[in-house]
């Protein structure tokens, strides 16, 4: 059995799990998420925890059980606590402003960049140079953060651009004459 799949997923209070066929749905205080479970993975609910096992013992099935366990664990954390990703804008005149489901960015281009946030993700701007992306789906929150960062990646000479708050930008020295 996969070492990841051996650990059960503990269900905190207020989180509901419903299994219908291969469809697993998780409901919590912050929202609801669904996952199509691979047919070779067996999901067993025992009391306040979920266990995952492969229907047969081959390598691929064990790997799929571990992957499913990790995805369901992220779903449980998402609907109970939520996920967030912080971005920083570094550069003169770089600004961000959240207006509903649209994030307006001034990133040194001749035009403002308007990013439409997908359903289930919200953005806050505590200051003009900080962006806080929140949601229940870990993959979607990370994807949105990566797409916003791709508008203007941090460049290695001055470090200007959009970066994750915990990112360390490798700097280069300018060419010498």
From Swiss-Prot:
GO terms for cellular component: cytosolic large ribosomal subunit. This is Large ribosomal subunit protein uL6. Pfam families: Ribosomal_L6 (PF00347). Keywords: Ribonucleoprotein, Ribosomal protein, RNA-binding, rRNA-binding. This protein binds to the 23S rRNA, and is important in its secondary structure. It is located near the subunit interface in the base of the L7/L12 stalk, and near the tRNA binding site of the peptidyltransferase center. GO terms for molecular function: rRNA binding; structural constituent of ribosome. It comes from Stutzerimonas stutzeri (strain A1501) (Pseudomonas stutzeri). GO terms for biological process: cytoplasmic translation.
